[in-house]
Amino acid sequence: MKDDLDFQVLLPDEIDTIQMIANWYFDEWQIPIEKTFLKLKSITLDDSQFQVIATHGGQPVATGGVYHRVGLLEKEPRFAIHQHWLGLVYTIPELRHQGIGAELCSQIEVNAKNRGINEIYLFSDTAVSLYNRLGWIEVELVVFGHRTVTVMKKEI
């Protein structure tokens, strides 16, 4: 499956795809659709932030991006010194556990490096073992709302 994937950076005029991602993020994490829509529109106009789409057979199946602002920074502003955050890595439910998320992360890293980004951070409570396998280093455990998340970093 992962050998049949294509990857592309989201462009500002891909309104239908932006809307689809906003719907995915609402369904998965209850992030308001309008908030995601506006965020994705704005980052597509900024070379230092981006969103990658994975497609299979021409159909979007996964997405994630590199952002300056992530939810953790609202509760823990001390992490704002780190400018690039991998976030909102999502694979459609029926294709999870097939290596798509790992391949997507690799493609995001390639795009980041090509943009001159040398270090990326993330936070997670559900996929720490995946990120460890992908070479990420655990930095700190942080209480974030009702859960404890692991802040991680990777030099690329």
Language model features by range: what are they?
Residues 89, 120-122:
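Conserved hydrophobic beta-strand within the GNAT/NAT acetyltransferase core sheet
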Residues 69-86, 96, 115, 145:
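A conserved beta-turn-beta hairpin within the catalytic core of GNAT-like acetyltransferases
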Residues 26-57:
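Active-site rim helix/loop that mediates acceptor-substrate recognition in acyltransferases
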Residues 88-91, 97-110, 133:
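Conserved acetyl-CoA-binding loop-helix of GNAT-fold acetyltransferases
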Residues 49, 147-151:
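Short hydrophobic/aromatic beta-strand or adjacent loop that forms the aromatic wall/cage
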Residues 1-16, 156:
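Conserved N-terminal entry element of GNAT/NAT acetyltransferase domains
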Residues 53, 59-75, 85-90:
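Conserved beta-strand in the GNAT
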Residues 114, 118, 125-148:
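Conserved active-site alpha-helix within GNAT-family acetyltransferase domains
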